[in-house]
Every structure is written in structure tokens, then in C-alpha cells.
Amino acid sequence: MACLGVLPDSVGAEMPPDRFWYVNHSCVVAAANRYAVTVQILEAIILVESEGDPHAVNVNRDGKGDRRGPLSLKQAKALVAELWKTGANFDVGIAQINSVHMRHYKIDPVHFLDPCINIQWAAFVLRQKINEYQETWTAVGRYNGSRNIAGYSWKVYRALERLAGIRRARGLLR
């Protein structure tokens, strides 16, 4: 994986608390190109879903998520393996891929702790939603299975604006 590097601490106040979203930018670009989705929206989804934490694990119960962590890779692997065995509904990794997809495609959830694999799946899921709903923001709203489609879309939109502000401050966006 090509890495663009971590940005200087002098701009830490504007950065999301976890900088993995930037370190994995090359994976986001590759996935966005492969599935014809917008790089910026994919990065905003990552910021909303995990703040860029590749080891994020969220257990879903009664329509609400229970975020576990922060976790080391070893801890995340153990937790994901246990959740998989018990048949729990959970989300894994940087873009919080849901266990429903893992069961459907018969993929060991530990693979989704790799940020680039996880991001590829995020782009795949988003592309499926865009194809199904024929409208980007409706697709974004349905990305995480939320019943509050408009609320989730707005959350992603606000993250998109936040990331655009960071890019502008760095001279990456004019």
C-alpha cells in the first residue's frame, strides 16, 4: 500500500482525532476508481463510521451500536472471531462493514481488519446502493443500514465539508 504520510502536528486541531483516513488515502482512491464512487464521499463515510480506525468493532443490538475499543489488531481479531462464532450482528474495520455481507459472501471477518480490503468493500457496498437507488445521497443514507436515511446522509455530508476544510487549509483544494 502506498502511503501519503501523516500530516504535521501543527494542524492537529483541524484533523480528525484519528489520522488513518489520510494514511489510507491511496486505498480509498483505488477503491473509488474500481467501483466508480466519489473519493471524497468514501473518505467522509470512513470518518463517520470509525474516524479512520482500522480496528474498530461495533456490536449491533436492538437497533443501536455498541462501539468496542480502541483495540489493538490482536484484540480486534479475537473479538471479531468470537462475535462471528456467536452469530452476532457486528461491523468491522475502517468503514464498518457489516457481518451480513461477510456471511452472505462467506468471508472470514478478520480479513476486514485490513484497511484496504475494508475500503474496497465499502466502495462495493456503496456502488450496490447507488445502483439500487439511482441517487447518490439516498445510497449514502442506506450505506450503514440506518433507519434514519436523511440523518445519516447529513452526517456524511457534514464530514465531507469538514474534510474539504482540512484540504483547503493544506492547499490541497482550491
What is each PLM-predicted segment?
Residues E14-R174:
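Catalytic glycan-binding domains that act on GlcNAc-containing polysaccharides
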